[in-house]
Each structure stands twice: as structure tokens, then as C-alpha cells.
Amino acid sequence: MLRTTILATTLAVTFASAEAATPLQVKVYNADGNSFNVNSTLVYGEKEAMVIDAGFTRADALRIAANVLDSGKQLKTILVSQADPDYYFGVEALSANAPRTPVLPKALNGNSLTVDGQVVELRGNQGLLAHRPYFWIPSIKAIVGNIGVFGNLHVWTADTQTVAERSAWIAQLDEMAALQPKIVVPGHMKSGTAVDISAITYTKAYLLSFEKNAAATKTSAELIDAMKKAYPDAPPGLSLDIGAKVNKGEMKW
């Protein structure tokens, strides 16, 4: 786990929609480095709420549950967007605070859900990275629940070990940017990161830099050093260390 002194924070952003009588609101819980800086998003309207991703620890889940209680809305769904532990380990503690709330996926039927009648669309579930989808909320032009967007951190590359996979990742980022989102909630982010399109730009630039430096270096140590120099403000940790070792063939993942 990443060890930092960053405190878990909650960010609240509200965007109006011309089409919706009551625009959806988005509240982001940003865990600290002990939970890999993973995000959980509460989406709520006039009456209903949905939690996208349940946090990594019990403490994370309880803080997310507090956000739900503070909203005063009925929690309709707990949606787990990714198959990584930091997205679902908190489900049990979170659902214990909302025992009537269904948890998805058991399996998500179709490609959309709703919050107070406003659509939350599943996207990016085709092609090489079909197992890494994201969710698009058109009424507020928001992208949430995606493992492929990072904010001011070293990007996790251990799960994309080929040039083809990383190229598909960049293509997905371009697809997201083409939606011209007003809100972008990274899967993981450094405290204080803006939840907007700049996170997509950051992640794409990082991947291109990683590709260039991977080709120019012989060992993981050299690659790690190059990426630290390219991103001096990104906290050090397992993401870069493991990603470099895996992509240099020094470690199996």
C-alpha cells in the first residue's frame, strides 16, 4: 500500500443540467495513500442515490456511508465498476449500512441504470479493454467509475503489459475526451486533484511518456528513475515500481 500523509478528503461538485428539473449531484470520496488514493462517487438527485465503487477498507466504506446519510437520499444501488479489490472490498461494510440496497454487479442487465430517472450509461465495454469500462452521465456530462484515469499519481501499468493494450487505453481516453465532459472522476487521484478533463489529459501524457521511456531504458530501475524525473510531484510507490518491473519482464503479474 502507498504510505503517504495525505488525509482522506471528500470533494463535492454540483453541475446544473438544462434538461433536468433537479440536476444530479456528484460527491467524491478520495481515500488516502493507504487505500491507494482510490475514489468512490456518490451520485444523487432529488430522492435517489447511487454509490459507484465501495472503497478499499472498512473505514473508507463507513465514510462513504456517511456521505449517503448526509445526502438524505435513498440509496438505490451500490455499483462496483471494476474487478480490483480497492473498488469492492468496502462493499460488505457499506451494504451493512443500507441492507435493502442491491449491489451491482451480481450482473448488470443492459448498459444503463438510472438515478431519479436520469441515465447512467455503461461505456467502454467493447474491444481489448472491455473489462475496464467507465460510466457516462449525459445529463451532467460526467465520467465516473473508471480505472483508466489517474490524477497526479504514477499510473498503474502492471495490468497493461503490451503496446497494444496501452494503445487501446489511449484510444479509450480519446473516446472519453471526445464527450467533452465537465466532470471526470479519476479512479485514483492525489488529494486536491481537479475532477475535470485535465485528468484524462494527464493520464494520456503519462502513458505516452511511459512508452517512450520504456523503449529507451534497459532495466526497471532505469525506467523508474526516468518516470520519477518526468513526474517529480507524483508520490512514489507500488504503482510505478511494480509497473516498471512487470513491463521490463523482471516480475510476473
Model features per residue range: what roles?
Residues 1-19:
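Gram-negative bacterial Sec-dependent N-terminal signal peptides
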Residues 56-57, 96-201, 205-209:
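Metallo-beta-lactamase
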Residues 178-183, 191-253:
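Accessory terminal helices/loops
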Residues 59-97:
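Active-site metal-binding motif and surrounding structural segment of the metallo-beta-lactamase
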Residues 37, 55-62, 85, 107, ...:
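Soluble non-cytosolic domains of exported or imported proteins
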Residues 21-75, 134-137, 141-147:
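Conserved beta-strand hairpin/beta-sheet module of binuclear metal-dependent hydrolase folds
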